[in-house]
Amino acid sequence: MLQVVYSNNIRVTGYSTAFRCSVADDLTIPNPAYQKAKRQRRPTWGIDANLKLWLTDETGALILPRGYADQLKKHIENYGIPYVEATDFTSGMAVDFGDWNTDYTLREYQRELVDALIDAHGVAVAPAGSGKTIMGMKYIHAMGRATLWLTHTTDLMYQTKARAEATLKGVGRIGILGDGKRDYGDGKLIIASVKTLQANPDIIDALNPIIGVVIVDEAHHFPAAQFLETAARFKAKHIVGLTATPDRKDGLQTYMYMGIGPLRYIVNRTSLYKFGQLVVPTVQFMYTQFDADPASEVYGDSVDAGGDDLDYIALMGKLIHDDARSTLIAKNIVRAVPQGPAIVLAESTRYCFMLREKVDALLAAEGKQHIKTAVVHAGLQRYAWRVAPDKATAERKAEEYGTEYKYVDKLRRWQVKTPQYTEKEFNDWRITAKQRKEIIQAATDGEIDILFATQLAREGLDIPHLSVGHCVTPKKGDTANEKSGAALEQEIGRIMRPDPKNPDKKAVWYDYVDDKVGIFKQQYYTRRKVYKRLGITVPSKKATERDTIDDFFKRQIF
């Protein structure tokens, strides 16, 4: 007889060969990395064509992800075979979160999302600015069980703590596990960084018997090793994921759904626009004159190029050191100051500091030293391992850098230890976690007019008065087959939050386009798709268009 035990995973015994094959087929998915390599005509040797989301243990039992439960039950029904099932969940300690703060009355879509998660665990999708954290707090208030809230950054950890203290009047002392702290609080709500749990598995063992609810914030990160090694170990009866961008660039969102549960609710973005919950920005493309040779014969025209490929990194290096491009951007940042507080988003920490230096000089020349600027980033690494196409290149680069190279058997590729910053840059630009927190707080309090930021700002940065955004480095958006522009969606979301102090807030987003370089031009086209998907009116493409800053401001859009 078939036997099924539901816990942090699903254990199945007594199955037939046909049943096993059916389940295995369900949980074997095409490997996006393999498909990407084939698209780019890159070597696929050593890359698995498929990924297995199931395994068998030493006793022969099938071990399946807990998010597969609904589909497994359908399989059992379809086969019409007798079975017995059991659960090994932790209901968790019953707790009283006190009264809900009525200053945070939920809108209809928020109530519907919470109700959907109460009915069944799984993933809920809601755009940035829709109140995901508030909805999460309402959910745990309704559940009344000891809760673990998982985040992937310390900044989100503290923002979540502030929301909990504002909404849950009886939450008591909130536990914090991260940022060097190991405080369990009163045990009602514990907010933890996955990095801390990953490094301290004993904490997971200590929490497992008492935690009945697990919230995975920014759940699209679940496929990362940190989440798989932490969240997937909890036996909590209720696990839910919250995210604004479920689709991942690497195509591994299936891991999220299988690890947490099916998609249970999607908040419609159109309704948020209708009720003023999101501000629709004006998008303006600013065309640069930057030109360079393609990154390489292989990757030059590939929209997927990037990451740790040495050719692409070299191309980006040329871009950020192009003085004419930097000057154009800096001038536009200064010209846009009257439109409101701004965030300047770059993939490169170095570019943030370079642009800030130019902007500060322009402001000083115009007698506008009262305009305050700051740079915030997620941290610096002096060196990083980068991919080389072959051994000869790796050896040559390592000699040039005065570092080392290696062959990674698991990845089947050569890597070079590549300097990211000079010693002076590293010492001048690095900031502590405390300093980063202080900068973000100053920006939140309106003490900073122009904030230069790296990937830190993609998620969770909650500064409602930001009304101007500058996307200053090329990045990929949505492709023809997938919604892979999650990073861009997160970034533009920073200026789409309504400002309670400015009900008439208008927002403008500057996208700097380097259309003389093939790969950057293709990335520009994919970004247009993201804007359209978000319901934003996009200016028409003009083959010969070269918008200048002066032309734009003469149009008097505002």
Question: Language-model segments: what does each one mean?
Answer:
Residues 52-54, 75-78, 84-125:
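Conserved pre-motif I regulatory segment
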Residues 119-143, 452:
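Walker A/P-loop
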Residues 146-157, 316-359, 531:
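Conserved strand-helix element at the start of the C-terminal RecA-like helicase core
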Residues 155-180, 361-368:
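Conserved helix-turn-beta segment of the N-terminal RecA-like "Helicase ATP-binding" lobe
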Residues 158, 173-185, 199-202, 343, ...:
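Conserved helicase ATPase core of P-loop NTP-dependent helicases/translocases
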Residues 212, 220-284, 531:
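Post-DEXD/H (motif II) to motif III coupling segment of the RecA-like Helicase ATP-binding lobe
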Residues 258-280, 291-295, 483-489, 497-558:
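A conserved SF2-helicase RecA2
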Residues 380-386, 419-533:
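Conserved RecA-like P-loop NTPase helicase motor core
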